[in-house]
């Protein structure tokens, strides 16, 4: 790719219990705007043979490096929800290939910090900060957790139409706890140099808006954009989100 050519390849990282399907409504909008979308299925989410007990950040990074190798050029990484932690680590490890990171209601945290720490802090005074946690069903060995459809509709998809919410809730899969209990290890010289944007979901019931604001204070420097949606704007408002993503990328790569 010539230096003057814009970066058009988007690596899209889903959150817990989800898969590449989570981006299905958004991808055509982004492709119409000239982007090439690479929605991934993270190891251990039910689309490969990775055992839940084997999931780790190292396995995630090895998989994503393969994705980047296949693309063969610079990329923009988009992380939704817990996919934000993975996006941060990918930026750290592949700082030359990752040209910017976008967080969509994403977990943008300090080096070594887990999202559970933020939840523990906020839930002292606001039980709603627990988000989906009280609704989780655990496997007997507690290696995986599952979100039941009713809980998904209430916490993740409350602003989606009933058909959309029901369809998405049925697609959720057991998620490895070792892939949820992760933290990125970041440095100022690598991750810290990558331009970032944070797209807030102001009506989010999973990652409350005030928690999103706290993360932006903890890890300052991201350009802020907002959308009046719940936790999954890519499903509830794909047209509006695609426009915001386009503006965010243009602003980051100017």
Question: Where do the PLM segments sit?
Answer:
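Active-site loop/oxyanion-hole signature of alpha/beta-hydrolase fold enzymes
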Residues: 36, 42-78, 89-93, 116-121
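Conserved serine/cysteine hydrolase catalytic core
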Residues: 170-234, 238
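Conserved HGGG/HGGXW glycine-rich cap/lid loop of the alpha/beta-hydrolase fold
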Residues: 5-49, 72
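Flexible "cap/lid" loop of the alpha/beta hydrolase fold
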Residues: 92, 96-98, 102-140, 179-180
């Amino acid at each position: 790719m010539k230096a003057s050519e814009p970066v058009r390849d988007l690596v899209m990282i889903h959150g817990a219990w989800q898969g590449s399907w989570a981006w299905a409504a958004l991808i055509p909008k982004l492709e119409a705007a000239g982007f090439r979308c690479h929605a991934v299925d993270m190891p251990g989410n039910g689309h490969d043979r990775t055992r839940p007990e084997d999931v780790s950040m190292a396995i995630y990074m090895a998989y994503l490096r393969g994705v980047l190798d296949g693309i063969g050029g610079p990329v923009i990484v988009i992380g939704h929800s817990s996919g934000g932690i993975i996006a941060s680590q990918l930026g750290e490890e592949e700082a030359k290939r990752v040209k910017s990171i976008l967080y969509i209601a994403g977990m943008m945290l300090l080096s070594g910090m887990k999202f559970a720490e933020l939840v523990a802090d906020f839930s002292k005074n606001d039980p709603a900060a627990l988000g989906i946690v009280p609704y989780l069903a655990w496997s007997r060995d507690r290696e995986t957790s599952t979100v039941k459809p009713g809980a998904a509709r209430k916490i993740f998809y409350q602003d989606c139409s009933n058909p959309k919410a029901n369809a998405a809730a049925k697609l959720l899969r057991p998620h490895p706890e070792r892939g949820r209990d992760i933290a990125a290890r970041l440095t100022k010289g690598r991750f810290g140099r990558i331009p970032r944007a944070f797209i807030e979901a102001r009506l989010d019931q999973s990652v409350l808006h005030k928690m999103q604001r706290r993360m932006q204070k903890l890890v300052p420097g991201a350009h802020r954009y907002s959308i009046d949606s719940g936790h999954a704007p890519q499903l509830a408002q794909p047209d509006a989100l695609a426009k915001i993503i386009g503006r965010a990328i243009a602003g980051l790569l100017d």
